[in-house]
Amino acid sequence: MDNKLEKMKELVEELNQYAYEYYVLDNPSISDKEYDLKYDELVILEKKTEVTLPYSPTQRVGDKILGEFSKYTHKGRLWSLDKAQNMEQLIEWHNRNLKVIEQYNSMSEDKLPELRYIVTKKFDGLTVNCTYDENGILIKSATRGTGIIGEDITAQIKTIKTVPLKIKNNHVIEVHGEAIMTKTAFEEYNKAAQVPLKNLRNGAAGALRNLDIKETARRNLSAFFYDVGYNEGPEFKSYREMMNFIKNMGLPQDKYIKECTNMEEVEKEIEYIESIRGELDYDIDGAVIVVDDIKTREILGYTIKFPKWAIAYKFEAKEITTKLLDVEWNVGRSGRVTPTALLEPVELGGVTVKRATLNNMDDIKRKNVKLGAKVLVRRSNDVIPEIMGVVEESLEESKEIQAPDRCPYCNSHLVQNGVHYYCENTLSCKPQMVKSIVHFASREAMNIAGFSEKTAEQLFEKLDIKSIADLYKIKKEELLTLEKFKDKKSQNLIDAIQNSKNCDLASFIYALGIPNVGKKTANDLVMKFKTLESIKNTTIEQLVEVPDVGEIVAKSIYDFFEDEKVISNIEELLNLGVKPYYEEERIDENPFMDKTIVVTGSLNNYSRGEIKDKLQSLGAKVSSSVSKNTDYVLVGEKPGSKYEKAIELGVKVINEEEFSNKIK
C-alpha cells in the first residue's frame, strides 16, 4: 500500500509539472501520449487504493452537479480600484501621491524611496481569489463578491488547467487573479453551442457561476494572477518582488509588466497597451497603475472603497445609449424563436449599430426592456451588440414587449420550453428547413460544394424539399427549372450531392444538427463509440464519459436519438446510399508533427480554416500567438505583427511554397 501511495505522489508531482510546462510555459517536455499513459496509471492506482490526493490532476474535472453556491469569507479584503478616464485625472492622482510622500519624508528619518509605478493590463474577466494552505495545496477559490464575502467556486476553478492545484510554499496565502475566456476558446465553444455566447466576459462569468462542473470545463477558461491579498509568510518589500513570487509559484501571469519612474513613461505604456488591444487573444478594458514600494503603499493607505496606491486607467467604452424601435422575432434551425432588437442607428466602436441581441423573454423582463425606451447597448469582441439595460427615465412613455404566440413565418402555434419559444412545424416552416439544409450541406458537415442559402430557399419553395433526405432524390431536370441554374451548375450540384454520400462519421453526426453538438463533440463521440449504431444506442451515463460532454449535452444527444422521426430520417439517408465511415487516424512522420505553428497573412491555396485543418492533420499544434516556444511561423501575403514578433524572437519563418515542399 505504501509503495502505491508513493508512486501516486510521484505521478501527481510529475503530471502537475508537465501540465505547468504545457499550459503555462507553452513548452511541453513530453508527448501527449506519454502524458496520457501516466495519467491512466494514476487513475488505476487511485481506484485500487481508494485514495485521491487533493492536488491530483484527476480532480480538475468532476462529474458532479453542485446543489448551490456556499459563501466564503476572504482572509484579506479584495479592493476595487479607483478609475481615471484621461491623463489629467491620472496626473492628479500622481500629484496626490507625491504630496503625501513629500509630507512623510519631511517628518520622518526613515525616508520613502523615489516614486516608482508598475503598469499592467486590466483584464476584462471575473476576479477570483485562490487560497493555498500551509502545504501549498489549493483549498478554496471564491469570487470577489462584496470584497469581504464571496461565493465558493473551488470546483469550477479546478477546471482551469493553468491554475496549479499545489504550489511549493509552506505558508497560507490568498492570491488574486482574473479568470478570462480567450477569443480562441470563445470561438471553439460557439462552434458547438446551441446558444452561442455573446462576449468573452459573460463566457467566463457564466462558466464560474455554473453548478454543472463539466459545463464549466467546456468553456476552457484561462487565468492571470497579479496580487497576493493575504500572506502568512515573509513580507514583500515591493510589488515586483510579489509578482516574482507569483511567477515562481507556477501561477499563470501575464508577461507584460512595465516599470515607470514618471508619468511620461506611464502614458507611453498606456498608449502601447491600447495599441495592441485588438491583437490580444483576450479582452482588456484598460491599464492598472500601482505603486511598487510596499511601505509607500502603507503610508498612502486606503479610502472606504479603494487603495490610494493603485488606479485603473479605463479605455473608451464600447457602450452607448439609443432608442429601441421594435423587436423582430426570428426562427432558427432548431425551431427556437428568438428576439432581435431594432434600434435607432447609432455609431459604436466605428460601426453603425442598428440591431442588438435580446436573448429571450426572461432576459427582456429581467432588464426591463420596453419599446420606445432608451437602452444601453454594448459591443464586445466584434460580435452582435447586446442590450445590457435601460435608462430608467425613458420608461414613462414606453410599451411592454409582447411574447409571440404564433410563428412569425408559418403562423403555427408556439410551444414554450423553459425560457424559450419553439415552432414545432419542422416540415413547412421555411427558416427551420432552409437552415437545416444549409447546415447539413456545409463544409464541416457533408461538404456539398456550391450549396448556398439561396439554393436551399429555392429547393424548399420550388422543389418542395422538406427533409435532408429529399436532397438525395433531386433530379437534374428539376434543378434546371430553378433561377440561375444552367446545365453545368445543375450537374455540378448533382455530382456534389452524390459525392457526399461517402462521408466520415464525425461529419455525418455533425450534419444531423444535434442540439449542443459541434464538430469537436461529434469527433469526440466517434472516437469514443466508433459506429453510428453505438452512438444511436448509447446511454446518458456513457455519454458523460466523453471529454467535455456534461449532463446538458448528453441529454441533448440522448433525446435526439430517442426521436422516432430522427431515426426514420437516418434510415432513409442510409437507404439512399449515404455511407458514413470511421477510420482510426494515423499520422505519417512529417516535419510538422508535434510542432507549434502560427499562421499569419493570407495564403493562396488555403483559407484560414483549411490551413488549420491541414496542420492538425499533420499532427501540429496551431497557436494564435508567437512565443519562444513557437517552432514555425507560416507567412502569407500582408502578414501582421506576428511576423515581426517571429523575426524578433528568431523563430523559423516559412512561406506557403516552402510549406508545400516540406509536405510533399
From Swiss-Prot:
It catalyses: NAD(+) + (deoxyribonucleotide)n-3'-hydroxyl + 5'-phospho-(deoxyribonucleotide)m = (deoxyribonucleotide)n+m + AMP + beta-nicotinamide D-nucleotide. The active site is at 122 (n6-amp-lysine intermediate). Gene3D superfamilies: 5' to 3' exonuclease, C-terminal subdomain, BRCT domain, DNA ligase/mRNA capping enzyme, Helix hairpin bin, Nucleic acid-binding proteins. The keyword Protease does not apply. It holds the Pfam family BRCT. NCBIfam families: dnlj, PRK07956.1. Zn(2+) binds at residues 407, 410, 423, 429. It comes from Clostridium botulinum (strain Hall / ATCC 3502 / NCTC 13319 / Type A). CDD domains: BRCT_DNA_ligase_like, H3TH_FEN1-XPG-like, LIGANc. PROSITE patterns: BRCT, DNA_LIGASE_N2. Keywords: DNA damage, DNA repair, DNA replication, Ligase, Magnesium, Manganese, Metal-binding, NAD, Zinc. The keyword Ion transport does not apply. It is an enzyme of class 6 (ligase). This is DNA ligase. NAD(+) binds at residues 32-36, 80-81, 144, 178, 314. DNA ligase that catalyzes the formation of phosphodiester linkages between 5'-phosphoryl and 3'-hydroxyl groups in double-stranded DNA using NAD as a coenzyme and as the energy source for the reaction. It is essential for DNA replication and repair of damaged DNA. Its EC number is 6.5.1.2. Its cofactor is Mg(2+); Mn(2+). Residues 587-664 form the BRCT domain. It comes from the Bacteria. Belongs to the NAD-dependent DNA ligase family. LigA subfamily.
